[in-house]
Regions:
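Residues within the helices of the helix-turn-helix
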Residues: 7, 18, 47
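DNA major-groove recognition helix of helix-turn-helix
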Residues: 35, 45, 64
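DNA major-groove recognition helix of helix-turn-helix/homeodomain DNA-binding modules
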Residues: 44-59
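Short, charged recognition helix plus adjacent turn
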Residues: 3, 8-9, 13-14, 22, ...
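Residue-level signal for the short linker/turn that defines the boundary of a DNA-recognition helix
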Residues: 15, 41-44
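Short alpha-helical DNA-recognition segment
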Residues: 14-33
Length: 69
């Protein structure tokens, strides 16, 4: 999974990966591994990221479930 959209959203909200990790209750290292595709986000983490980054429900697939072509 490519999370460039999610990284862009983090930056657009004026946050760092460390800020986001703290707000969703995981370590910055864990968030970085997930953003690089080494491990998957849990449903709870996706929900929390959407809350923290103000991602509307209709846009969730674009951030978390976009298929690779």
């Amino acid at each position: 999974m490519n999370y460039l959209n999610l990284l862009g959203r983090i930056r657009a909200r004026g946050m760092t990966q460390s800020d986001v990790a703290q707000k969703i209750g995981i370590s910055p290292t864990t968030l970085n591994k997930k953003l690089r595709g080494h491990t998957d986000f849990t449903q709870t983490e996706i929900r929390d990221l959407c809350r923290v980054l103000a991602i509307p429900d209709a846009e969730i697939p674009a951030y978390f479930f976009a298929a690779k072509l």
